[in-house]
């Protein structure tokens, strides 16, 4: 058990905490303040505060109490020291969580810098876009001004055009002048005076002459209007030239405005692209912030766990601070009472709780090792090993998940067992693997464990990070899916090849059946040779059909027996007959081909007759 000592006088309290003092000595300087000088013992004279030696001070002391003061009474109290303890696994997790948090913070800062760069780029584009927008606005104002200027001229031209159209509409069906009207009436009278026309024709001409005489006033009026319109031709030409000139100016302004608008469109497209990138970076920043907050929460949880494990140490620090305050105030009885209560409380917990004893033993290991003591507090023997292994930090458990999954992947990628391997060979091959697996826990247990008093739950395997485990599972699923797709593709290819071979065989079979039917039809006048050839062909077809039929799955041993039985038979093999060249006469296929050629010639002749003789005759009629 490790304790801290405390010494206290009536005017001060001194406490010792291990090698360091728990309480600071506080000397009473009332006498020095009253005299205003510092006393130096062991010298022959007394030096004042300003460095001069006083003659009055060289005189012998007047009182014996000043010469031989009473020794100060010192009170010593001992408190049980509670050390802080850092769990190696928890410390490794804290370091790993801190690294992850720093990585997340750096990643977020990189995204934030990229976002700031994109925003500055967007502001630069906007600064380039503002003068172009102002220039476009000026061009719009110029175009609108010219359009306002050309509007009254277009109205006047429209007025002239409407008057001309109205005059043309009124003069539709009328003569353009009086001379033309008189000439037309004269021509009609000449036709009437001609004796060869009929009475009806003469009446019609007389009626037409009357109608023309009735339109004389309208013709005169239209002629006057036309003369008036001719007077405004110069004015219309001037207005038209003005409109044309203004239109040319508008076209030039529109051309310049279109160039500015093209630049504006390019910049707007750039702004839209930058806005999309900014939105994507903003989403990434939100996700990075969420990841950073999650990592920081995990780090805080681990810190809370560490602080929760060191609750007794924090209580000890609080008690030490209160003892320091009481000793500074000189309250000896309060310090004594507090010391008694704390010691009784500690001993009660020590006697009643085994977990408390184990926790305390773990906490003082570092202190015992620094003072070269053994686990039970005695001096360490020369041949005794130090207990420094207790404080070593275990390596992080996140480095081990990758090799743990390799055997599973290798087992998946390993080829299937061959058919010639017997079960006995498989058992013999599996035996060394089982022996190696059985030796692995022995090797792990052979490692010297210094924590003999710790509970066995600390010997559990290091935990695998859930994120990495999920990633490895996802990779395994992807590989499984790839293998399944490859298997399906191979199966589909095999099925397609089988279907193609089956279709080819069926086509060959149908072709052979057609040839056989044709030979039977044409072989009505054949002799014995043709009959023998037909029989041989039939036999060959039957043999080939038997060969094309899918053979039933038969083992190798049965095939060997079948071959042995066949070799023992005395009957000749049918292969010589099957491979014999088929004899086919010329007349078996020449007659159908000749009939087909004759039919084609007749059809071609009918088509030519219809195209060149029948159709022209029908169109001429």
UniProtKB/Swiss-Prot annotation:
Induction or repression: Induced by brassinolide.
Subcellular location(s) of the protein: Cell membrane
Region feature Disordered, mapped onto this chain: 374-572
The organism's place on the tree of life at top rank: Eukaryota
Topological relation to the membrane, as annotated: Single-pass membrane protein
InterPro entries assigned to the protein according to its UniProt record, in alphabetical order: PPI1-4
Keyword Coiled coil in record: yes
Comp. bias (Basic and acidic residues): 374-387, 448-516
Main location: membrane
GO CC, one annotated term: plasma membrane
Biased composition (Low complexity): 430-441
UniProt keyword terms in alphabetical order: Cell membrane, Coiled coil, Membrane, Transmembrane, Transmembrane helix
Coiled coil stretches, renumbered: 250-305, 466-524
Segments traversing the membrane: 589-609
Family: Belongs to the plant proton pump-interactor protein family.
Function noted in UniProt: May regulate plasma membrane ATPase activity.
Quaternary structure (record): Interacts with BRI1.
Name recorded for this polypeptide: Proton pump-interactor BIP131
